[in-house]
């Protein structure tokens, strides 16, 4: 499975009890957890009630539920626990399974840090530029990941970032103190946040080396982090 997907589960059930009128009554709960037992979402619950006819002799009830795979969870093995109760027989059964999640893995940190800063040619590029060189009139794109921020009650996070662009002599060419704010409360703890920035170079932009000073602030953890990355205009 991939990060951010919501697969629909359809699980057949056997061995249930029927009444004299061929009625069945099942309830179920489905939990998805990480390797540490942390729930990915609130447990999915439901019930199956049906009146069977002679034509349904080969029919099996199915448990249907959607499992949300959060978009920024680490790749790896995850657990699925299904609990089914037969209300007529006053019996229950548990079933366990595992599933693998694919996606990007960001090295964790105990303190605020920026990882994987990469310059791009366009907004949608997935491969970083081997040499961060642009021409006057180009758009400078960059992406990065922020991790190590503190989580508050209910897995809330509150981070923001701004930037300054310095010329080769250290003077300021551009500044955007608050380029973006990322504040959210999630069911599953989100340990990193992707960031993006862009600059539009003037057609008469002076050639030379420039430095982006990226300043990240963790408002809940009272932390700051500064990253410096160079690019050139040729």
Locations of the language-model features?
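Intrinsically disordered, low-complexity terminal regions enriched in Ser/Thr/Pro/Gly
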Residues: 1-234
């Amino acid at each position: 499975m991939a990060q951010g997907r919501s697969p629909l589960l359809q699980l057949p059930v056997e061995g249930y009890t029927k009444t004299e009128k061929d009625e069945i009554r099942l309830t179920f709960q489905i939990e998805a957890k990480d390797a540490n037992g942390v729930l990915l979402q609130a447990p999915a619950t439901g019930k199956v009630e049906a009146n069977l006819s002679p034509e349904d002799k080969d029919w099996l009830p199915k448990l249907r539920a959607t499992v949300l795979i959060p978009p920024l969870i680490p790749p790896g093995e995850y657990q699925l626990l299904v609990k089914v109760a037969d209300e007529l027989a006053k019996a229950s059964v548990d079933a366990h399974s595992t599933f693998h999640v694919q996606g990007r893995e960001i090295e964790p940190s105990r303190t605020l840090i920026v990882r994987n800063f990469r310059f791009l040619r366009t907004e949608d590029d997935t491969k970083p530029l081997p040499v961060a060189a642009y021409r006057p009139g180009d758009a400078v794109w960059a992406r990065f990941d922020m991790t190590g921020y503190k989580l508050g009650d209910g897995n809330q996070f509150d981070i923001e970032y701004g930037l300054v662009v310095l010329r080769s002599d250290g003077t300021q060419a551009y500044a955007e103190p608050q380029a973006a704010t990322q504040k959210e409360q999630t069911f599953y703890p989100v340990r990193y946040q992707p960031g993006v920035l862009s600059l539009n170079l003037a057609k008469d932009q002076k050639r030379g080396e420039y430095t982006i000073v990226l300043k990240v602030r963790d408002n809940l953890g009272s932390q700051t982090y500064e990253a410096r990355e160079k690019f050139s205009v040729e």
